[in-house]
A protein has these predicted regions:
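Single conserved hydrophobic/aromatic residue that forms the stacking wall/gate
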Residues: 1-13
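N-terminal, charge-rich interaction modules
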Residues: 14-97, 220-223
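Short, surface-exposed beta-edge/turn micro-motifs
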Residues: 106-109, 116-117, 138, 146-147, ...
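A short secondary-structure junction signal
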Residues: 122-124, 130-133, 153-155, 159-164, ...
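Conserved metal-binding segment of the jelly-roll/cupin
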Residues: 143-163, 173-175
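Accessory, usually C-terminal, subdomains that scaffold auxiliary metal cofactors
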Residues: 162-223
Length: 223
């Protein structure tokens, strides 16, 4: 049995014998190798808008949403954060307590926490030559509601987890065209990880993700 204990900005995920993952805050120095907090933007408009979006019992991801892309922050993302490149602003909402998989892109991803949430992260440099990855290397980070973060392209990540069994809502910004259907030509060994456009995914076998490469070794971490 794994439970959580929230103390200030820190949380521990524990089982009865040992600590599985120590959760820091994205405001802590330990997050800097995975990403950065974008402190100079106002997220209040888009967080309030997300109040009207459902929080299903499973997890739903929408790559681009018309209402979210009609916000001021979407313009800021295109003009400033992504340096004039077109982006898509969507969301990932629902209930999730497991790691299940890790993915990466060739570009940074921006997340805006519309509720408190947890991200389980790793580094691409720890992926082995056979594209396996030890889940013991995963680190967890608490993201307070309203916080905008840039997750670097070198960071392994996946769907957020809720805090203390609650659901989560997360705005997701990526370069336009990411996470769409793709024809995999298997030109390189890495192509077996290609799950969608600009999305390389390593799954845990316990997650039973159809068509995914099951390269996560160790526990399928539960928050």
């Amino acid at each position: 049995e794994i439970t959580t204990r929230l103390v200030g900005s820190e949380m521990c995920i524990r089982d009865r014998k040992k600590e599985v993952v120590f959760l820091q805050s994205v405001l802590d120095a330990g997050f800097k190798k995975y990403g950065r907090v974008i402190a100079d933007i106002d997220t209040s408009e888009i967080v309030k808008l997300m109040d009207s979006y459902d929080m299903p019992e499973d997890v739903v991801y929408v790559a681009g949403d018309e209402k979210l892309e009609n916000t001021q922050i979407h313009k800021v993302m295109e003009e400033s954060i992504y340096g004039g490149c077109p982006v898509q602003t969507g969301y990932c909402n629902g209930h999730n307590q497991k790691l299940n998989a890790l993915e990466y892109h060739r570009s940074s991803e921006v997340n805006i926490a519309a509720t408190d949430m947890i991200l389980l992260l790793g580094s691409r440099e720890d992926v082995k030559d056979d594209f396996t990855y030890e889940t013991s290397k995963v680190e967890g980070f608490f993201v307070p509601e309203g916080t905008a973060i840039e997750v670097y392209a070198t960071t392994l990540h996946y769907a957020p987890c809720g805090v203390d069994g609650q659901g989560f809502k997360c705005v997701v910004v990526l370069p336009k065209g990411t996470n769409l259907d793709v024809v995999n030509t298997h030109a390189t060994a890495e192509d077996k990880l290609l799950a969608a456009s600009n999305k390389w995914l390593i799954a845990h076998e316990d997650a039973h993700i159809d068509g995914a490469f099951n390269g996560l070794r160790g526990e399928n971490i539960t928050v």
